[in-house]
Regions:
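Electron-transfer interface patches adjacent to heme c in soluble/periplasmic c-type cytochromes
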Residues: 188-209, 349-364, 368, 477-481
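Alpha-helical transmembrane segments and their helix-start/interface "positive-inside/aromatic belt" motifs
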Residues: 5-22, 52, 103-107
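Helix-to-catalytic-loop junction in kinase catalytic cores
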Residues: 163, 212-215, 315, 431
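Sequence context of c-type cytochrome heme-c attachment sites
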Residues: 37-59, 65-203, 221-305, 329-337, ...
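Mixed-charge (acidic/basic) macromolecular-recognition segments
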Residues: 305-380
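Cytosolic juxtamembrane amphipathic/interface segments immediately preceding
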Residues: 2-11, 88-96
Length: 491
C-alpha cells in the first residue's frame, strides 16, 4: 500500500512538484524551528517565513498532489482510448550532450533568478515597513499624520515599531489591513478625515512597553510649561506641576501609572470615540475584588464597546500630535521663531490663526502673512515692514499648515490629546465625580491624585528662579535719585 502511495504522488510531474513543495517546506520549517530553539534571532521576517510563507507552500503542495493524480488518470484514460502508449514521466536522457546542455543552462539561469527574486521580495517587504513608504507612498492621505509625526518625540522611531511591533502575527494582520488601505486609496474610498481612535491597533504591551516600562517610570517629575500673556509685552508666564508619574514603589502602585499596573485591570465601556465612558470596571488581581463604576443617569448606546485600558488611552497622540493655536504661538515665541518684542503678537497670532479657514496651504501662508502685516500697519506703522513682522507671518503660516489640511478636512482641535485636561476632557472622562458604584463610591476628581500645582502662570516666581527654570525679571532702570553720585552728576 505504501509503495502504491509513493508511486501515486511521484508518478507524474505535477504530483512530483507538489511532493517536493511539501517535503522541502517541512524541512525548512524544521530547520528554522531548530535555529530559533538554539537562540537565533531573525526578527519578524523569520517568523513570517516560518509560520506564514512555508506553511502556505506546504498547503499548496498538498493541493497540487491530488490535482496531478487526477490529471494523470484523465490523460492515461484518453491515451488508452486512442490506443496511444501511456507515459508517466518524460524521459530525460543525460547521455545526450544536447540534453545536458539544456539542463545545465536552465539551472544556471534559475539559481540567480531565484536568488534575485528572493532578495527583491525581502527588500520590498522591508521597504513597506519604512517610515518613508508609510508617510509618502500615500502622500495625500497620510500628509497630516506624517507631518505631525515628524514633529513628535517619536520622530526617530519607525512607523512599524508602534503600528506593528515584533512577531509574525501582527505583521500579517497589518499587511492584510494595508492591502485594503491600498485599494481604498487607489479607488478614492478612504474617509476624510481619517477617523480615530484606531480600533485595530495592537495593545500597548506589545509596542509601547518594548521601550517604556511603566513599573520603572516612578516617582514625581517637575513639568514646567511656558506661556505668554495677551498683553502688549507678551509677558512670559510659567506654570509648574509636580506630576505624580507613580509606578510601583515599595510594593505599592501609585500615581498615574497605577492605571496600567499588572496587579490592576481597568476596563471601560465607551462610545466609538472613547471620549464618553459609560461604565468603568476595576479588578484587583491580588484581592480578587471587582468594582463597576457607572455613569450616573446614562446607559451605553448601541456601538459602545468594552476595552482594557492601556497606555494609548491617555497617550493617544504620542506620535501624531496636533497642537492648539495657543500652544503653537507659545512654542514659536519660546523658540525664537517669533520676536517677542512685537507688541500683542501672542494675542494677534492666536486671533489670526483661528479667525479664518483657508482652502489650501498656499492661500493660508499668503493670507496669514498679510493679516499680520495689516495689524502692524494699522497700529504700529513703524514696525509694519520690519523683518520681525515678516518672520512672524512665516512662523504663523507654518503653525497653521502643520495642523490644518483642507484636502483631508483636518482643522484645529479635530484630534484631541487626552494627556491632561486643558484642551480636551482627557482625565475627566473618568475622573468626573459622575461615575459611581452601586454603593455610591465615586472616582475621585481630586487634582492631587495626578499632580500638585507648584506655580500657575507666574512671571516672577522665587521658587522657579531658585530651581533655575525662570529668569528673574530685569531690574528697572535707575533714577537720578537712585544712581551713584558720579553717574547722576556726570562726574
Amino acid at each position: 500500500m505504501i509503495k502504491h502511495f509513493f508511486a501515486a504522488i511521484t508518478g507524474n510531474l505535477i504530483s512530483l512538484l507538489g511532493t517536493l513543495m511539501m517535503v522541502l517546506s517541512l524541512l525548512f520549517i524544521a530547520a528554522l524551528l531548530v535555529m530559533q530553539a538554539m537562540g537565533f534571532e531573525g526578527g519578524a521576517y523569520i517568523g513570517i517565513i516560518t509560520f506564514v510563507v512555508l506553511p502556505v507552500i506546504f498547503l499548496a503542495g498538498v493541493a497540487v498532489v491530488p490535482l496531478g493524480i487526477w490529471l494523470h488518470k484523465r490523460r492515461d484514460a484518453k491515451a488508452a482510448a486512442e490506443g496511444r502508449p501511456v507515459g508517466h514521466l518524460p524521459v530525460i536522457d543525460l547521455n545526450q550532450e544536447s540534453t545536458r546542455g539544456v539542463l545545465l543552462g536552465f539551472v544556471a539561469l534559475a539559481v540567480p533568478i531565484i536568488a534575485i527574486a528572493a532578495g527583491l521580495t525581502y527588500k520590498a517587504v522591508h521597504y513597506m515597513d519604512s517610515t518613508e513608504f508609510c508617510g509618502t507612498a500615500c502622500h495625500n492621505v497620510m500628509q497630516p499624520e506624517y507631518t505631525a509625526f515628524q514633529r513628535s518625540p517619536h520622530a526617530s522611531v519607525g512607523c512599524a515599531g508602534c503600528h506593528i511591533g515584533p512577531g509574525a502575527q501582527w505583521f500579517v494582520k497589518a499587511k492584510i489591513s494595508g492591502s485594503w488601505q491600498l485599494i481604498a486609496v487607489a479607488l478614492d474610498l478612504y474617509p476624510r478625515p481619517i477617523p480615530t481612535p484606531v480600533h485595530a491597533l495592537r495593545p500597548a504591551n506589545g509596542t509601547c512597553e518594548q521601550c517604556h516600562w511603566p513599573t520603572k517610570f516612578i516617582g514625581e517629575r517637575l513639568k514646567v510649561r511656558t506661556h505668554y500673556a495677551d498683553d502688549e509685552a507678551n509677558t512670559e508666564l510659567k506654570t509648574a506641576l509636580m506630576v505624580r508619574v507613580g509606578g510601583k514603589q515599595a510594593g505599592q502602585s501609585q500615581g498615574i501609572h497605577w492605571h496600567v499596573d499588572p496587579n490592576h485591570t481597568v476596563r471601560y465601556l465607551a462610545d466609538p470615540s472613547r471620549e464618553k465612558m459609560y461604565e468603568i470596571e476595576l479588578t484587583d488581581q491580588l484581592e480578587g475584588s471587582k468594582k463597576v463604576f457607572k455613569l450616573d443617569g446614562e446607559t451605553a448606546p448601541q456601538g459602545a464597546e468594552w476595552r482594557t485600558m492601556d497606555c494609548v488611552d491617555c497617550h493617544n497622540r504620542a506620535s501624531h500630535i496636533y497642537r492648539s493655536p495657543q500652544f503653537e504661538v507659545d512654542l514659536a515665541l519660546a523658540e525664537g521663531r517669533i520676536d517677542r518684542s512685537l507688541p500683542y503678537i501672542k494675542r494677534e497670532g492666536v486671533r489670526i490663526l483661528t479667525e479664518k479657514e483657508y482652502p489650501s496651504h498656499e492661500e493660508a501662508r499668503t493670507g496669514i502673512a498679510a493679516a499680520v502685516k495689516a495689524f502692524y500697519s494699522g497700529n504700529y506703522p513703524d514696525l509694519a515692514d520690519s523683518p520681525a513682522v515678516e518672520q512672524a507671518g512665516k512662523a504663523l503660516g507654518d503653525a497653521y499648515c502643520w495642523n490644518n489640511f483642507p484636502h483631508m478636512k483636518v482643522t484645529w482641535n479635530l484630534y484631541p490629546d487626552h494627556i491632561g485636561h486643558q484642551d480636551s476632557p482627557g482625565c475627566f472622562r473618568c475622573h468626573d465625580n459622575k461615575h459611581k458604584t452601586e454603593t455610591g463610591e465615586k472616582i475621585s476628581k481630586k487634582c492631587s491624585t495626578c499632580h500638585n500645582l507648584v506655580a500657575e502662570e507666574e512671571s516672577d516666581s522665587k521658587l522657579l528662579q531658585e530651581l533655575g527654570v525662570q529668569e528673574p525679571p530685569p531690574a528697572p532702570p535707575a533714577t537720578a535719585e537712585e544712581a551713584p553720585a558720579e553717574v547722576a552728576t556726570g562726574t
